Amino acid sequence: MSTKPFRALAAAASAAGIFTYARYRRELRLLSESVDAGGTIAETSAGPIEYAETGDGEPMLVIHGAGGGYDQGLMIASDFGKDYRVIAPSRFGYLKTPAPEDYSPAAQADAHTALLSFLGIGRAIVVAASAGAPSAIELALRHPQRVSALILLVPRTYHPKQSIGADESVPSQVVLRIVEGSADFLFWLAMRVSRAWVVRFLGVPPEVERKASEQERERVSQLMKSVLPLSARVHGIELDGLTTISEWPLERIAVPTLIISAEDDLYKTLPGARFTAHHIAGAELHVLPHGGHLMVQQTATVSKLIKRFLAARKPKPASRKSAEIELVNA
């Protein structure tokens, strides 16, 4: 029996593998060059902090979530921050911001304040997504005079009976191990051959993402790519995993506050979002019926909510029952 067909098949598979890996190396190089060139290092009183900024107007500090960096912060603000001076830092351990011995949310909040001072900014709107929320809350508690408004998007917050994190499904846990192992190639490959697994790991029901528009699916693809290179973000991811959340004295927060979460967020941020809104006087809570942790197909709705909130903000009278809960049918 001739072995030529098997040799030909092996040669084709080898060529495909070489081509795939070469494509990965090229894309990773471009991503690395882009992220290396986009940030600036501020030598603050809290140590060096990488950041980027764009736009003019009222200052808006945008704090990224897990797996991010200043680039993710800019992406978060791209739909609603066009009329603002957006400042997007890389949190401790992400990209070029080193991790100090004290990497707690309180220390990170002090670092945010140090960056604002370095830039000559007295007060700023503070927007935080996911794992960026703890330091944003600490900022509002520790330095209230520096915060003009607080916006928390699918936030990691305290709840007495519920913690957040990747769901326990096999796909999510496999991708989690890839991320924890800083395996750039495996993550890149998973985006192409097991997209639904990565989508689920990022907190979105795969069927929600599949039904989204092509434009929205491309936004999800860009958010996926923003995790690369993992090797430049893995220390920050580790620190987020080590950070424990304790109950805050939320009743002390007096700035206008907007919180947005989703019913189907697989990271289960909604219970904590409700708890947080209930304990901050005058806070607004908006619950999206679908969209998951990335708020898929909800970009226009979220932007509208934020713009309306910022246009109408003013201090609310203190009340334990002041949280307004609204279901957004979008």
Residue ranges and their predicted role:
Residues 1-38, 118, 316-330:
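Short amphipathic, positively biased membrane-proximal segments
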Residues 50-96:
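Conserved HGGG/HGGXW glycine-rich cap/lid loop of the alpha/beta-hydrolase fold
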Residues 107-124:
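Conserved acidic catalytic loop of the alpha/beta-hydrolase fold
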Residues 150-182:
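Flexible "cap/lid" loop of the alpha/beta hydrolase fold
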Residues 266-272:
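Conserved alpha/beta-hydrolase "acid-adjacent" motif
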Residues 283-330:
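Catalytic active-site module of serine/aspartate enzymes centered on a nucleophile-bearing elbow/loop
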